[in-house]
């Protein structure tokens, strides 16, 4: 079966594993998924991730993060720009997720970065997802 939106699949696998309180989840790898995983790690939403070679496209193993009492660090993930309806914004129109408590992941000419980094670099791009 052909996957039409691999980024939505990536976010859904993380959301489902998080809701089931799994320690980790394995996801087929791609460069944009590696970039998103790096952002989630840097912003403190996941513990870590590693890329394993499976003689095909590779697999990303994402290690989820929970609080001291088992509460979820990721409250929500939402895909914004979809294959059928792309969402591009200028640097001035970059969204703030929950008044700055969450992040927007933006694919720009400077790479895949957060909304805060895009504001600092004054670049717009495609809003990939919101994480809070």
Curated annotation (Swiss-Prot):
GO biological process, one term: translation
GO terms for cellular component: ribonucleoprotein complex; ribosome
Keywords from the named record: Ribonucleoprotein, Ribosomal protein, RNA-binding, rRNA-binding
Pfam family, one: Ribosomal_S8
InterPro entries named in the record: Ribosomal_uS8, Ribosomal_uS8_CS, Ribosomal_uS8_sf
Molecular function via GO: rRNA binding; structural constituent of ribosome
UniProt-listed SUPFAM superfamilies: Ribosomal protein S8
PROSITE patterns for this protein: RIBOSOMAL_S8 (PS00053)
Record's function text: One of the primary rRNA binding proteins, it binds directly to 16S rRNA central domain where it helps coordinate assembly of the platform of the 30S subunit.
Oligomeric and partner information: Part of the 30S ribosomal subunit. Contacts proteins S5 and S12.
Family: Belongs to the universal ribosomal protein uS8 family.
PANTHER family linked: 40S RIBOSOMAL PROTEIN S15A
Protein name: Small ribosomal subunit protein uS8
Gene for this chain: rpsH
